[in-house]
Amino acid sequence: MKESEILYPSLSLSQYIKYYWVLKTDKIEPVMIQTIPSGCVHLVFHRGENLNIQAKGLQPKNFIRGQFSAYGSLVSAGNIDMIAIIFHPLGLNPFIQCPMSDLYNRYIDIEDLEDIELNHLKNSISSERNVQTCIQFIELFLMKRLIDIDYNHKRVQNSISQIINQPQIEVNTLAESACLGYRQFKRIFTNHVGMSPKEYYRVIRFQRVLYLLQNNPEIEIADLTYSCGFYDPSHLVKDFKEFSGCSPTQYLSSHSPYSTFFSEDCRLNVIKSNRFA
């Protein structure tokens, strides 16, 4: 049995959280899941078996997954009962007391953050079997930590909007729009998002390729190249291989392309649920 459910946050938290993803499975045989850079940070609570990071050992029981710049594989070898909070690009930043750059390419055990309230949330979720009650615990925790967004947060949010809406934009233009020198802009962006603006731009460009392939698998490579802001097809293929491990053609032969960044839903037999009040 496999059950995947998407739950949406309250309106007060919707600018921070894309969705909650609840995944349950009682399969015993190993299942491999490919991971790719998504452009988002995740806060994950395992109530069943931990997933195994191929060649690196088990994931922590409860952790933050920072921005990743490379593909990887997870292996499930037991019952999964997981609640994941999928944040918008800047969504986690206001709620924890560390730069997002410290999370880069890492799974950070919640216990290592020495955050008493977050550890209390972890324990509450571990002992509560009702998913909706767990989501209420999460929302209460986050609502208590809501703070006024600072000016640099707004600057970076505007830069992310430009990256999303203008695939041909030059990264140096982002600094100019923020009225900052590039080095200062890069430092602020990296601390808020978790990777440099150039690298983040490349991840979002890769997610855009997936989204266009998802909606039109027959799209011409030239159209895909231009629409996503690549110099030429070989540039597209090079980046795609770096982030997925294979060329677009190879990927299409073994995967159904899907962008977790640009698409509203998550795959795996999604059951849509109403937002929490």
Predicted region positions:
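Pre-recognition alpha-helix immediately N-terminal to the DNA-recognition helix
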Residues: N158-S159, R205-R208
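Short beta->alpha linker loops
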Residues: L180, Y201-I204
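Short basic/hydrophobic patches in alpha-helices and adjacent helix-turn junctions
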Residues: R208-N215, Y226-S227, E242
